[in-house]
Curated annotation (Swiss-Prot):
Protein location: Secreted
Record function comment: Has antibacterial activity against the Gram-positive bacterium M.luteus with an IC(90) of 125ug/ml. Has weak antibacterial activity against the Gram-negative bacterium A.hydrophila.
Record protein name field: Scygonadin
Annotated signal sequence range: 1-24
Secreted as UniProt keyword: yes
An annotated GO cellular component: extracellular region
Tissue: Expressed in the ejaculatory ducts of mature males. Not detected in the ejaculatory ducts of immature males. Not detected in hepatopancreas, female reproductive tract, eyes, exoskeleton, subcuticular epithelia, heart, gills, stomach, muscle and hemocytes.
Xref: InterPro entries: Anti-LPS_factor/Scygonadin (IPR024509), Anti-LPS_factor/Scygonadin_sf (IPR038539)
This protein's UniProt keywords: Antibiotic, Antimicrobial, Secreted, Signal
GO biological process annotation, one example: defense response to Gram-positive bacterium
């Protein structure tokens, strides 16, 4: 009887530890279209620059000789201790940009550079 109780408690504790990151990932996935849209909007504004969570970022794309666009997003002043560069590639420039933004945000999230609450506040203030 004791071993089954101990096993049950172990499972509950493990679920408590494992579930939150998954939920955070799901929350970020739900917010991702809004994040990408906001940053794409900033990219399209002349002389506006790109600011994500209060950090100045660079989002750029280049057309390659093979007809594909490659895009990169970085926020050097924010991630200088652990450089993060989001990368995207597509035949469509907008899709390459979206890919680089998504890749950057997911990587920054993996390195715990922000919380979901911070992203929600940033979206609400935008």
């Amino acid at each position: 009887m004791r071993s089954s109780l101990l096993l049950g408690l172990t499972v509950v504790v493990l679920l408590g530890v494992i579930v939150p990151p998954c939920m955070a990932g799901q929350a970020l996935n739900k917010l991702m279209p809004k994040i990408v849209s906001a940053i794409i909007y900033m990219v399209g504004q002349p002389n506006a620059g790109v600011t994500f969570l209060g950090h100045q970022c660079l989002v750029e794309s280049t057309r390659q000789p093979d007809g594909f666009y490659t895009a990169k997003m970085s926020c050097a002043s924010w991630t200088h201790d652990n450089p993060i560069v989001g990368e995207g590639r597509s035949r469509v420039e907008l899709e390459a940009l979206k890919g680089s933004i998504t890749n950057f945000v997911q990587t920054a999230s993996n390195y715990k550079k922000f919380t979901i609450d911070e992203v929600e506040d940033w979206i609400a203030s935008y």
